[in-house]
Amino acid sequence: MISDELRAANSAGAIATGLLALKIPVPLTTVQWADRHYYLPKESSYTPGRWETLPFQVAIMNSMGNDRIRTVNLIKSARVGYTKMLLGVEAYFIEHKSRNSLLFQPTDSAAEDFMKSHVEPTIRDVPVLLDLAPWFGRKHRDNTLTLKRFSSGVGFWCLGGAAAKNYREKSVDVVCYDELSSFEPDVEKEGSPTLLEIGRAHV
């Protein structure tokens, strides 16, 4: 027979599990989230370890993660940490805001390389992302070179921007471009990369 104490403990556990669905995280800005949770992997960083937002990066990252700002265009020099900022913002959207997002690289091969050398090590080294990736390190339909589908249901795509088909049939809230100046100005005669994704947030 089940004792009253065990029955009470089981009930309390079931109630606690059920209430998790109602838990709302304390809202954080992009920079607050990144300084608390984001880590740079050794494979693709000059200074691996815990991320610390530099003063000039604060406004950029907070603009990228702000729901009231629909488009962010950044003209930059080399070596300002843009790719790492972009990854931090993507991680923020995935874990903190539960947003489906799509990151474009200039070509399909560049997108696959980016997924392998930047995204996968970032998932591994950011504990709150790894918690959402039970498939990490093994073959799984939610773990491909074009899509990472997290246990929260959030999807992250990384695709090449040279093929018009990559702009279709993706239900995402956020679209980011890395190295936009390297994209074809007219994607297979269907329009510019940013016009093909019009109506969504752009970074």
Regions found by a protein language model. Give the residues of each.
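Phosphate/NTP-binding elements of NTP-utilizing enzymes
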Residues: M1-R200
